Regions:
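ATP-binding glycine-rich loop module of kinase domains
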Residues: 1-42
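Protein kinase catalytic-loop region centered on the HRD/HxD motif
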Residues: 86-98
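Activation segment/activation loop of eukaryotic-type protein kinase catalytic domains
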Residues: 98-144
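Activation segment signature within eukaryotic-like protein kinase domains
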Residues: 81-82
């Protein structure tokens, strides 16, 4: 077993408070248990955010993780990424927040097997009553954005919260197959055909439906 090292994650979103960061920290617990330390949160009033600190065997960026294996994930790794990211989506929704989109630079990999989302600049307000993300300022663009987010023409705007699922599905699918989701045509067979009949195939397929109302997350 590798010796434990200390790591920290700096955060600085105005809307967050200590209670929210305790929820965020809980996402780290499965990644560092049982060898790591319980994450701690220290607020910083000057930055209107804080620092989450913890110990683990290793922490690398997802990009560094991918470089070791031809910039792709194996099936079990992609499944873990999908489940880890969706758990974080669910945790955010409980606090009325959502994520605009995903990309390689948004994740760290803890102990070589757990994927944690750390890009707080992509977190926006979620209206749980209407199931929409509230976009009230310019957002960070990304390759794996949903069509409705790519075509956003005015701010403020409200877009279906399933825009996050579209991004998650297209992102994980590309990490696994190396294929890009096409703008037109039979995106499912071209995009993730190589994993047809697997649990992850059907999960991704539903995430990337063109109609936001048809999207969902089912991984069974």
């Amino acid at each position: 077993v590798d010796a434990l090292k200390k790591f920290s994650i700096h955060v600085s979103i105005d809307d967050y408070n200590e209670a929210f960061w305790r929820l965020f920290s809980s996402d780290l617990v499965p990644a560092i248990h049982p060898t790591g330390s319980v994450p701690t949160f220290e607020s910083d009033s000057r930055e209107k955010g804080g620092v989450i600190s913890f110990s683990a065997e290793s922490v690398v960026s997802l990009y560094e993780h991918l470089k070791k294996q031809s910039m792709m994930l194996h099936y079990n790794q992609a499944s873990q990424l999908m489940m880890n990211a969706y758990t974080f989506i669910e945790n955010l929704e409980k606090k009325n927040f959502g994520i605009t989109c995903f990309d390689i630079s948004d994740f760290i990999v803890i102990n070589g097997q757990y994927y944690v989302f750390v890009n707080d600049s992509k977190i926006v307000e979620l209206d749980n009553k209407d199931d929409v993300l509230v976009i009230d300022e310019p957002i960070q663009k990304g390759e794996f954005m949903s069509p409705e987010l790519k075509n956003l023409t005015r701010i403020p705007s409200r877009i279906p919260k399933t825009t996050t699922l579209f991004s998650l599905g297209s992102f994980v699918g590309t990490m696994l197959t190396g294929e890009r989701l096409k703008a037109e045509g039979d995106i499912h067979s071209d995009f993730i055909y190589s994993i047809y009949y697997t649990k992850l195939y059907w999960c991704i397929k539903q995430c990337v439906e063109r109609n936001p109302k048809d999207r969902g997350y089912i991984y069974i």
